[in-house]
Amino acid sequence: LRDDVPVTNPNVICFGKPGRGKSATTKAFILRMMDFGYRTLILGDPKDEYEPLCTVLGVEPFRIGPGLPARINPLAFGPLAQGWEHLDAGEAQARAAIVFGRWLTLLRGLVGSQRVGETPVPFGPVEENVVKAGLRLLTGYTHGNTHLVETTIPALWHLLNSPTPELVEQCRYASTRHFLDETRLLRDALGQLTSGALAGLFDDHTSITVDWSAPIQSLSLSRLEPLGDEAVGIALTCLSSWGRGMRE
C-alpha cells in the first residue's frame, strides 16, 4: 500500500468461480474487522448465508417477504433530513442534490427493469424530469418547506396518475391530457412495480428498527426465492438505495 495515496472511497470486491470460498472469505473478513470496531450491514441475503453468523453473534436477521410484517421504504431520507429546518440555502441544496440523485438512480433502475416485449421501458431526460418534479412536490421541497415529508413509490405513482396543475406546468406540458399521454409508459411501469414486485415489501414506510450498535444486521431475502430472479434483483436494488441513504 502507498501511504502517499489517500483512500477516500474504500471498496472491496470479492469474485470468483462457484465453490471457491467467496462467502467464507467474506465472513472471515467481517469477523476479523469486528476486532477493529467495524460493524456489518448485509443489504440483502438471498440464500440466508449470513444467518448462522448472525445467530452466533446473538442477532436475528430481518426477514423480508410476502406476508411478513417488515417493510423497507427505498425513498427514506436517512440522516440527511435531520435538522433540515436549520440549514442555510447552500447546504439544503447540496443535501437535496444527494437525496434526489439517489432516488433518481433507484427509479431509473426500477423502471428500466420493466419491459415492453424485449425492450426496457425508457427512462431518459423527460422521464427523469417528471419523476424529479413529482418527488420534489411530494416532499415539500418545491415549496421550500422547513420540514420535508417522506414519500413512497406508490405515492409517486398516484401523483403521476392524477397530476396536479402545478406538476403539469412544471413539466412543461400543454395540458393534463398531454401529460398523461406522454407519461403512459412511465406510469404503467411504476404501477406494475407497485402492484407487483414491490407490493407488501417496499411500498410503505420502513417498519423495522435497525440496531446500528449491533455487530451485524442482516436483511434476509430467502422468502423471495419462489418469486424468481427478477423479484430478488428488484429487492436488492431497493435495499441498496435504502442502505446508501442510511449511511449518507
What does each of the following model-derived ranges do?
Residues P69:
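Conserved phosphoryl-transfer catalytic core
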Residues T55-G58, L75-E248:
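P-loop NTPase motor domains
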Residues L1-P66:
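Glycine-rich phosphate-binding loop of nucleotide-binding enzymes
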Residues I72:
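Short active-site-adjacent structural elements
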